[in-house]
């Protein structure tokens, strides 16, 4: 099965969602999870997965995705390498500054040791900006993201506001959600009631490529 790293990650998401919730994600949920600007990109990858024989789609059903053969849930372990080694896709950029438009879909990947991360990440994002330097997160770093919708106040998260994504410190107080930078040169971002807001995942560590 000749799949790109993005397609393998989508296949993994489908398998995990079926395992945990009993149903596959919708095309909209896939688009959001991977930072696509619309469902057409998700449709493109689903068509490729179907052509490769990895999934079967049922016309007319919102969640009409069926696995032909489920990928192993420990897919991130690189075949032929020790269990502590991960092979993670680099799925684009994330803003450490003002939020930027989603730019996720690269098929690059990195092989690395699990010891750098807790919990184990599902993918990497390249940081753009310096708003998180007081947390040791610098422009050009690769941050690990553990995919989850749940986060607590005080955790560093990758968040989506409308069609933009950013990495910030999450602060929740009553009905107020703020995303705080860790650089005094930047102002907090207050999430407005009419904005489409979601948690894409938790920050769980970083790599600093030589530069």
Curated annotation (Swiss-Prot):
Cleavage, annotated site positions: 96-97
One function term, GO molecular function aspect: DNA binding
GO biological process, one term: DNA repair
Superkingdom of origin: Bacteria
Catalytic residues (positions): 131, 168
SUPFAM superfamilies linked to this entry: LexA/Signal peptidase (SSF51306), Winged helix' DNA-binding domain (SSF46785)
InterPro entries: LexA (IPR006200), LexA-like (IPR039418), LexA/Signal_pep-like_sf (IPR036286), LexA_DNA-bd_dom (IPR006199), LexA_repressor (IPR050077), Peptidase_S24_LexA (IPR006197), Peptidase_S24_S26A/B/C (IPR015927), WH-like_DNA-bd_sf (IPR036388)
Stretches that traverse the bilayer: none
Summary of subunit composition and partner proteins: Homodimer.
Full protein name: LexA repressor
Organism encoding this protein: Stenotrophomonas maltophilia (strain R551-3)
């Amino acid at each position: 099965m000749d799949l790109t790293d993005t397609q393998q990650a989508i296949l993994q998401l489908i398998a995990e969602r079926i395992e945990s919730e009993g149903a596959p994600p919708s095309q909209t949920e896939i688009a959001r999870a991977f930072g696509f600007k619309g469902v057409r990109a998700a449709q493109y990858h689903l068509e490729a997965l179907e052509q490769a024989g990895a999934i079967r789609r049922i016309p007319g059903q919102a969640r009409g995705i069926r696995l032909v053969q489920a990928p192993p849930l420990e897919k991130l372990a690189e075949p032929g390498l020790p269990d502590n080694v991960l092979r993670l896709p680099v799925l684009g950029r994330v803003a450490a500054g003002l939020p930027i438009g989603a730019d996720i879909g690269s098929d690059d990947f990195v092989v690395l040791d699990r010891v750098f991360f807790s919990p184990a990440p599902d993918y990497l994002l390249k940081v753009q900006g310096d708003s998180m330097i007081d947390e040791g997160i610098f422009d050009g770093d690769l941050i690990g993201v553990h995919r989850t919708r749940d986060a607590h106040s005080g955790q560093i998260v990758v968040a989506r506001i409308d069609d933009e994504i950013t990495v910030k410190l999450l602060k929740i107080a009553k009905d107020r959600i703020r995303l705080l930078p860790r650089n005094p040169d930047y102002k907090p971002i207050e999430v407005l009631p009419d904005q489409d807001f979601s948690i894409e995942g938790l920050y769980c560590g970083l790599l600093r490529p030589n530069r």
